[in-house]
Amino acid sequence: MHEMSITQSVVEICTQNAGGRRVTAVILEIGDLSGVVPDAIEFCFEACTRDTQLDGARLLIERVQALGRCRDCKAEFALSAYYDPCPACGGFGVDVLSGEELRVKELEVE
């Protein structure tokens, strides 16, 4: 489960940016194409934050919808996978606009 190491990295990032203060909430953005399972992150969060500045902090996960733009017709549309064809023209040349995110968006500290 790579979500455990991802969650450990999230805790490290939060600790480094909290300035020694206790963290009460973490807002994490996870894109639909990131390959990260939000439920697994939630499961790992309590174990990874125990006895740290984040102990007892709330984890709020914001899902980021995957969006793409067709290189041929320039249509923008929701993606469910990397290789979805354009629904407007059927083209497979699609640029991902969003949905790959995995970032700490915000920290609440005391």
From Swiss-Prot:
PROSITE patterns: HYPA. The keyword Cell wall biogenesis/degradation does not apply. GO terms for molecular function: nickel cation binding; zinc ion binding. Keywords: Metal-binding, Nickel, Zinc. Pfam families: HypA. Ni(2+) binds at residue 2. One of its GO terms (biological process) is protein maturation. The keyword Endoplasmic reticulum does not apply. Belongs to the HypA/HybF family. Involved in the maturation of [NiFe] hydrogenases. Required for nickel insertion into the metal center of the hydrogenase. PANTHER family: HYDROGENASE MATURATION FACTOR HYPA. This is Hydrogenase maturation factor HypA. The gene is hypA.
